[in-house]
Amino acid sequence: MSPVITMGPFHPALEEPYKIDVVCEGEHVTDASIRVGFNFRAIEWLAERKNYTADIALFEHVCGICSNVHTLCLSRAIETLAGIEVPERAQYIRVVVAEAERLHSHLLWAGIACELIGFETLFMACFGLREKIMDVLEAISGNRVNYAMNRPGGVNRDIADPGAVLAAVRAIADATSKQLIPVLTTDATVRARCAGVGVLTRADAIAYGAVGPTARASGLPQDIRASAPYEAYDRLLFEVPVRQEGDVFARVVVRALEILESCRIIEQAIEQMPAGPFRGDDYPKVPAGEVCSRIEGPRGEVFYYVASDGSDTPTRVRVRTPTFANMPTARPMVLGQTFADVPLIQASLDPCYSCTDR
Amino acid sequence: MDAESILHMLDVESAAEHRTDGWWVDVPDLDVRGLATLMRTREVRFVTLTGTPDTAGGYRLIYHWDADGALLNIATTVSAGCIASIADIWPAADWVERELRDYYALVFEGRAETPTLMLLEGDEPGLFSRTSAAGREIDPAVTARDAAEAERKES
Amino acid sequence: MTVVRGLISLLVFPGALFALPAGWFMMWLQRKINARAQGRIGPPFFQPFFDFVKLLAKEPVVRPRLQGFLMTVLPLAAVASTLGAIALLPVFPKAGGFSGDLVLLVSLIEVGPLCAVLGGFVSRSLYGGIGASREAVLTLAYNVPFLIALFALVASAGSFSLAGVALAAAWPVRVLALIALVACIPVKLHLNPFSAASAEQEIYAGSTTEYDGPRLALWELAHALEWVALTGLVASLAFPVADAAWPVRVVVFVAVSVALVVVLSFAAASTARLKLAQTARWFLLCGSGIALSALVVAFVRL
Amino acid sequence: MSLLDSLVRTARRRSPWLFHLNAGSCNGCDIELVACLTPRYDVEQLGIRLEASPRHADIIVVSGPVTRTTLEALQTVYAQVPDPKVVVALGSCPASCNMFAGSPTVVGPLDRIIPVDVYVPGCPPRPDAIVAGIADAVAILCGDVPRPEPTHVPVVADACATGGLS
């Protein structure tokens, strides 16, 4: 009789409630099952009962960490349905905010991952660095979390001081490449905890439908920004980091390199950003129809399906968040690993349970 | 493999429509397991499955696929409330099917078990269907629990 | 006379009156250094003291009688035995008095971790149990180099008495043995990189997960005293000059202890936590290697 | 007031340990609470620590509108924290359910389930507001400020558990 250890729903390793039942032989994991739904607020149900304006605010609260991707994806769905174009300046502003959000999300993740391997000093360093990008987001939107930037037809606020954004982004790129990446990739204790741990093979990544950095660390070069560019991404140069190993260390490396790529994108976007209006005059009227919308969030592909009957309330909004796709891959990853690795492996997916549950 | 060749292989090229958000096609009598196997062998990524009630009292299921970056939306209709499961072919579909059971009490045939995903263990499936009439007029001060309590007092 | 001396070393120096504030000071220093290394300001000076008082003043959770009794007695035993170990430290090797031998000191130091293991099991919490079993595995692992190193000192000094060891051990043996002993301290104090027994992110607070209020306060107290006992053990063995005046001895004893706290804190702040198996392997290979070389040197010299 | 009393009060004021509980929150509040620990805000200066076990805590910080699925765990954790304890409702969700009001799976607001002592408004509150809220909680904890009258009589578990779904 192997003991079943239940982690959660409230566990210090987890910012959010979820349960993972781990079956152990000694310290070795022989089976695991994940239970979600603790954050289930039936947002999709609520969305069918609120108008589009209220829905934008509602979906901002799918997740407090990647709130911008949700409003962006929903706004794009509404724009596609209504057949309206977004002013060019707004497209660039959206890119800047989306990449700034990726920066803060990746730094947050790096911090939490360090905390999980007990490296508190590096956790603090990551969060210290993250405050720089939080300042940028606050300067642009007025908020540290939940930026309320997107609306159908454009963005709500202009970037008043592009120079400050550039300076902050350059400082982050500098600190990342000179301090964060060297420590993460060379420290012996970090390597001992990450390399070869929690491997997701390429075949499993496809079968489980992994997206985002998780898929890219397993050798799948998928990125919506490159494969189906939206907003201004087709006019910006960036690379999609891909690793073949599929272990925790590969996911660390992919995200670290993405931090640098995001800095590059923001720099280009600020420099290329044209003058002009940043939003349309009116809220659009949404005709009947259905539409899908996808963007690349920090954790991977975000998918929205919106169906409208022509009224001011959608008849169905379906959200497939990246963690919903990624989370099942945790099971093949933890099998055969030690119990001490389980929190780190699940964290290496950059899970967001409030996204998953909605 | 690209979306057009897939549509050709499925023999639904003529019915398919290309929109800004990808390819759309309605196949009322879709062989979902055949489709899933084809997609699996061609490495077309399973994106997700959307379920939504249709006006006729049945459900419209849309299988979303990513073929070389292009979105392929293959819709079908479920009138009897059950459809074949593809979770054994695509482990990625496991959670979505469980979720759809929680929301609309749809039955996916061929699964050994369909545990709840979002609801508590032992809850009746079909939360969205059961509560579809509720909450159209939301008073932010009144939560569903108050409504339930009021109902209990009345009865 | 010896009884008076014994009581003084138990209650005054290096015992309770000195050890309590010293333990709190060391805990504060470790947290402060950790905070400064992370670019933070860190806790105020009296923090561990206030933590202790606050915990004492909390209302204990009602528990079944036997469990409640055990959960009070075990941390008390840890406090008492650690205090006893401190009293035995050979700060004044020539002063005579109650001069216990090394075996007694080591067994008293070991009672603390043993109580923690038992305490984790009697708390009937899953995480307490896991923490306790990890603690047990680690105790086995680090005790291999710990005991070999002490044995090397004994072999070199030709005496089991603490004072004898402190005075007579040869320098090459002493240095190697002390390095091995220092490496064992982080395990006992749950410091990085050997803190697997209290890995908050995996098993909550390890064996103390279920302890609350006054009972937790006792564990905190035992923890503070362990700081003094372990750093003190190294400090007293590292300063063997027999005829220094007592104020000099005290100053050196305190200074070496504090220096050790600083070194250990910096090491903890700049490392990640190793897994249980990795920690155990480190002690059985590297730690034991150093200790064994000390032993070899001791025998060759003989 | 005796010397011992004033020592205990000072100790409580200077050593508040928190247990954070996410009852269906969107992460916004939670991440701002974590930000409080980091160099810019550094609440360890005030003796504040985020504890892993509810048994060690003095202050329970709850974020989120309380979903059906977290309800039972919430009540367990509340019972596990030894007295004296203070409950802080972090953000708008535990105060009013925010935009999740009306959802069939939300049973909040928090004060219907456990008594709430301090509300920290905001969606999410900024870290400085969170620190100020914890300071309010500490004042209640050490007895400087009387505990507020409960706004609701907490309801029993069964009535909540079936909320909206029966």
Q: Which residues are covered by each model-predicted region?
A:
Chain B
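Terminal low-complexity/charged segments
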Residues: 1-155
